[in-house]
């Protein structure tokens, strides 16, 4: 399965909830620094991503300034992880042997202290995918990037979401599409971010004060480290008309994770996508030209433009 981006970022639709982050906030400095560092150092972010969107994922990572490596064999993933700055696992398209291989890869990444991003595409659909995602609870990622329904489904799957009303099955994605709005996933996103942080603090040799992050894509994206919830209005509705916008965002988030902390990486990737989508909107004439213009915008948008984007604290 593949994220078609119908739940990805879109026009702000007048979304105004939240307090604006000041122009002189250190958060904005961190974002600008992350964008610059990626372009200056071209970090390697390895991706185990789905077959449908692999081309856009790789091209987006390159356009953002990083280096891409696309791996599918478990031994390739482990060997490449040793030299990669960060890694990305997307469960959109799976083969039966991945049921055992992917949890082992996750355990190995954490043993090596290698940060990684999880995109739980279509969480809650299919026994193989469900078994893999359940196993990730014992070897959790550093960051999660997903749509609202996937975030809710994963939190329910891990027994973390106490705010969902009704049967958890009601919140399963319709295929890869979200049937929930971003706002309804706030509690699940916070719970997941807190769990990731707690687990990595126990087992990682990295700074225990570094918090993990969850990014929820939607009309006004949500990013949280489990303590603070940020909303990021903006982007383009045309994102809903190209396959792989959400998947490629996960790959770019991994690129930023190679040079920055999880919260900064999640904010930087989402804001870059919002700004690039807005730029592409002004020159494109349909889905085909939009995708080309979008990749060009990922390349051309400046660090200052990304850092100056609208950021609200919810």
UniProtKB/Swiss-Prot annotation:
It comes from the Bacteria. Its EC number is 2.7.1.50. Its cofactor is Mg(2+). InterPro entries: Hyethyz_kinase (IPR000417), Ribokinase-like (IPR029056). One of its GO terms (molecular function) is hydroxyethylthiazole kinase activity. SUPFAM superfamilies: Ribokinase-like (SSF53613). This is Hydroxyethylthiazole kinase. It comes from Bifidobacterium longum (strain NCC 2705). The gene is thiM.
